[in-house]
Every structure is written in C-alpha cells, then in structure tokens.
C-alpha cells in the first residue's frame, strides 16, 4: 500500500525516535526533505553541527562526501546516506597521485588545502580542509608559501585573490552546476532586474564573480539578504537554496537561473540544478531509516588521517 506524504513524514518521525536519529539536510536537496530535517545548512554548518549532536544515528540528506565527512568527525555514530548514488563529480577531480607529486616538488613549504567537497581519501592526504565559508580565513593563517588547493579551481582562484602573499598551484576540478554559468546568463538577468543585487557562489568562474555585488557561500548568501535593504535579488547558486530564502525572507523576491518563464523571459536559459542533490527524496529518507542503510563504513586508519585536517577546519 502506497503511503501519502503526510503518512510518510509521520513514519519518518516515528523511526527517528526508534533509532535515536537526527536528520541533517543540505540547502540544495528538495524542499520536501528540507522541511522534515532537524537541521538545514551548508557543508560547513553540517560538518560542525554533527559533532554537537547527542544521538546514535545521523541521516545525512546530501551527497556522499558530506556523509563521509560526518562519519569522520563522528566515528562512534551510525551515519546514513539515503541516496547511495548521490555523489559529487567534483569530489573525484583530485587525485592522491597529484598531491604526492606536488609534495615532491615543494617538500618543505607546501600546504595541501582540501575543499570539503572531496573524497575522504583526498582529505586524508591533505594538511587542512576548508569550506567556501572559511577558505580565505584558513588559508591566510597558514605559514606555508605554496598552496595546492584541491579540487575546485574556481574557489582556488577566488581565495588566491584574497591571499596575494601565497603562491597557488591550481587543480583543474570544478562544480559543473556553478562552472556552467556564463557572463551572458548573468548579464541577461541583470538587464531584466537592474535593481537586484547579484549574489554569487565562489565556485563560479572568475568572470562571473566580477559581475556580482556579493560573493559568498550558500549560508553567506542567505545571511547577506538579511542585512540588505534590497527587496529583490539575483541568486547565482543552486536553486535549492530558494526554499530557505523564501522561508526566511517571505517579503523578498529571488531570481534564479533559469529565469522564470513569464513576459520577460524568452528562452529559459541555463538551469542551476544539481541532479545528485535532487536524488535525495522523501521516500529515500524513509527507506534509509526503515532499513538502517546505506551505512557509511570507513576504516579506522582512513578516518583518523582524514580527521586531522577536518578538525583544523572547525577550529
């Protein structure tokens, strides 16, 4: 017998109590999943919040690297990934071999800085992890001169501009959702909504960042809206954040890519949608709790090596 959404939500709540489980969701997952989560946030918030929870089980409604990060920081807890096929392509755009090559080239004055959007194997080979929310602060405090920043090239270029005393070695990884935004996409939105500040995630390309009024992580974008007097905003990041923005600021208007199909819009345009985040459905959260799967399993050695750079990120 098929359950209604209301029945499924009730069953999820019952299973949470039974398993002593907390649901944490990323801003990019579907709205129906965000609505049943105990906590919603970006990668940095979810990493930090997981360490503060008093529970036996964490359901990580996001992609695989987030669940792995949660397990590394909470080795004693059961961490469940509802959508086992929800992976981040960028997380695999760095290799252990390339890290070792750079360490040979710069044996004494190199820091490997790992964006949290990476596999646990890459984290284990790094000196420190960062998120888009704290990357500039963390890198600026490092004593090393050479910075090998993996895996995202666009965030690396943004951080490099804020840390001119460092010499960056760039990897060639990218987030396909943010990297795909063009200057033309942003200019078209600006032409339609000239009074709307443009808020951009630093995973976008440099030429796109140059057009914006504010650069920030997902949480940074959300917080900026709260400090602004503007009534409408152009949001250049994954469209899932629109749920939190409209919930928190119901009196504001938000414009995403693609543009709304209305009188002003003639072509639709590039869509900022992460297909992997959208794999995390209400049904999969229910199934995950019901069957206690997929449990994230990592070796003790791998978790220990990845924990050191991740804990520095939280300091």
Locate each region found by the language model.
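Active-site loop-to-helix "anion-binding N-cap" substructures in soluble metabolic enzymes
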Residues: 1-236, 241-315
């Amino acid at each position: 017998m098929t359950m209604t959404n209301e029945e499924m939500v009730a069953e999820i709540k019952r299973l949470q109590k039974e398993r002593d489980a907390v649901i944490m969701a990323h801003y990019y997952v579907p709205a129906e999943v965000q609505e049943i989560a105990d906590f919603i946030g970006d990668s940095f918030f979810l990493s930090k919040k997981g360490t503060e929870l008093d529970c036996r089980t964490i359901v990580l409604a996001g992609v695989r690297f987030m669940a792995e990060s949660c397990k590394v920081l909470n080795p004693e807890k059961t961490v469940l990934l509802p959508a086992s096929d929800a992976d981040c392509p960028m997380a695999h755009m760095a290799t252990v071999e390339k890290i070792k090559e750079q360490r040979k080239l710069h044996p004494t004055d190199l820091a490997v800085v790992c964006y949290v959007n990476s596999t646990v194997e890459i984290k284990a080979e790094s000196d420190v992890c960062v998120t888009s929310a704290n990357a500039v602060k963390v890198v600026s405090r490092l004593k090393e001169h050479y910075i090998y920043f993996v895996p995202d090239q666009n965030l690396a270029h943004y951080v490099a501009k804020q840390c001119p005393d460092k010499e960056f070695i760039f990897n060639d990884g990218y987030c396909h959702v943010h990297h795909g935004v063009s200057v033309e996409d942003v200019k078209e939105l600006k032409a339609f909504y000239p009074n709307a500040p443009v808020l951009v995630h630093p995973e976008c390309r440099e030429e796109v960042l140059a057009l914006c009024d504010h650069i920030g992580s997902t949480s940074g974008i959300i917080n900026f809206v709260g400090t602004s007097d503007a009534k409408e905003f152009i949001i250049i990041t994954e469209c899932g954040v629109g749920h939190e923005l409209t919930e928190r600021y119901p009196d504001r208007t938000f414009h995403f890519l693609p543009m709304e199909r209305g009188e002003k819009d003639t072509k639709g345009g590039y869509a900022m949608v992460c297909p992997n985040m959208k794999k995390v459905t209400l049904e999969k959260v229910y199934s995950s709790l019901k069957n206690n799967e997929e449990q994230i399993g990592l070796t003790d050695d791998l978790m220990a090596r990845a924990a050191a750079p991740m804990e520095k990120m939280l300091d």
